[in-house]
From Swiss-Prot:
InterPro entries in UniProt: Ribosomal_bL35, Ribosomal_bL35-like, Ribosomal_bL35_sf
Name of the molecule in the record: Large ribosomal subunit protein bL35
Taxonomic classification: Bacteria, Bacillati, Actinomycetota, Actinomycetes, Micromonosporales
Family to which the UniProt record says this protein belongs: Belongs to the bacterial ribosomal protein bL35 family.
BP GO annotations: translation
Underlying gene: rpmI
Length: 64
């Protein structure tokens, strides 16, 4: 049976930390930033951990 291929798109969107947590960039920082308050844009910077219900599916897509 051939090897499973990891989902390329998911691999570009998330990163697995050394301890196995899956982190992603928060949504809402691509465009229309002029109308958003600077407090909101600051809050949206940085990486956040993926929600618990999604972890199992993402790990399957990544082949882990």
């Amino acid at each position: 049976m051939p090897k499973m291929k990891s989902h390329t798109g998911m691999g570009k969107r998330v990163r697995v930390t050394g301890k196995g947590k899956i982190v992603k960039q928060q949504a809402g920082l691509r465009h229309n930033l002029e109308k958003k308050p600077s407090t909101r844009t600051r809050r949206l910077t940085g990486l956040v951990e993926v929600a618990k219900p999604d972890v199992k599916r993402i790990k399957k897509l990544l082949g882990r």
